[in-house]
Amino acid sequence: GTCAEQATTRDRRLQVPAGSGSLKVWKLGDVIHSTPTVVAGPKDRHDAIYGDQSYSAFLQKWYNRRQVAYVGGNDGMLHAFNAGYYHPGDDASASAPANTTEHGWFTTAPAANSSGAPLGGELWGFVPYELLPQLEFLSRADYQHTYYVDLPLKVADVRIFTADTDHPNGWGTILI
């Protein structure tokens, strides 16, 4: 495009790899103050710290749940990415060379040979209702940077739910 066109439109394309001439659209809004946060199995250990034995059933049920990485972007969305299922290095076979350590690995589904969402693939994006009217600013030629979902995230195991199969004894994990 001409210099005049470039001055009046926002371009979210990048050369990938740099200098290749191949342009790809950068799909994720900038992340400035929102720290990516991974939610894995329950970790608050209310049973051990506070002696609350009602937490144990929740811990056991969700100990090996899918790990999800969350981050807020200045595209107005909270993003959730598949971080997979962790499998510890557990090959005790006689075929392993002596003095070797098998490291753990991540897969897309609980069973090592099954398929699921690709590792690093976006599971979903959520736009808070209050931001919907403001998203139009992103497409304006005179766009000035706006901070949307741009604060650190907090994760906690809490006992606020109605007890059911997904929430043993009312426990669940929330993201704030």
Please provide the spans of the model-predicted regions.
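A fold-level detector for beta-propeller and closely related beta-sheet-rich head/sensor domains
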Residues: 1-176
